[in-house]
């Protein structure tokens, strides 16, 4: 559910059920804790149609619950409008980045800055690996990476 604000960020992964909804929920919590949530429009999306209409992966939801973060999202695919209306589109891996750059080239009024979320990681882990075929500890790794990256992104754009 996108929020209205003066800045906007869209988190993107392949299916929009693991990494990007975790990043979205983490960032929502950070901006809420900083009392700047009114300044942000935040959402997440997929490059593919594989999981459209599905809730986040239960393992990701369990991981977020453990950290006291609520997740409320239904998977959707990125749209042409997203490229024109979001300031930042932050994705998880090189495949996402290639797909997004290819799609953005088909949008005349693309204003979004498309980057890897991992480019903000102070620990320099550029890629946020897909935990879909992994276990609970893989989801924890994704959470920790998203937390570090989202904090750094917020500091840079705040």
From Swiss-Prot:
GO cellular component, one term: cytoplasm
Keywords of the record: Acetylation, Cytoplasm, Hydrolase, Phosphoprotein, Protein phosphatase
Major subcellular location class: cytoplasm
GO terms for MF: acid phosphatase activity; non-membrane spanning protein tyrosine phosphatase activity; phosphatase activity; protein tyrosine phosphatase activity; SH3 domain binding
Compartments where found: Cytoplasm
Any GO BP: chemical synaptic transmission
Family: Belongs to the low molecular weight phosphotyrosine protein phosphatase family.
UniProt-recorded name of the protein: Low molecular weight phosphotyrosine protein phosphatase
């Amino acid at each position: 559910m996108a929020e209205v604000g003066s800045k906007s960020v869209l988190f993107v992964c392949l299916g929009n059920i693991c990494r990007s909804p975790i990043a979205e929920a983490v960032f929502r919590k950070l901006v809420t804790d900083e009392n700047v949530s009114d300044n942000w429009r935040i959402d997440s999306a997929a490059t593919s149609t594989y999981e459209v209409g599905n809730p986040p992966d239960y393992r990701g939801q369990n991981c977020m619950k453990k950290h006291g973060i609520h997740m409320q999202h239904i998977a959707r695919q990125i749209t042409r409008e997203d490229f024109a209306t979001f300031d930042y589109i932050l994705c998880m891996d090189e495949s996402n980045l290639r797909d997004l750059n290819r799609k953005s080239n088909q949008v005349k009024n693309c204003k979004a800055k498309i980057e890897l979320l991992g480019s903000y990681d102070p620990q320099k882990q550029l890629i946020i690996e897909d935990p879909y075929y992994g276990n609970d500890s893989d989801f924890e790794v994704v959470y920790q990476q998203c937390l570090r990256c989202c904090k750094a992104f917020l500091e840079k754009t705040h």
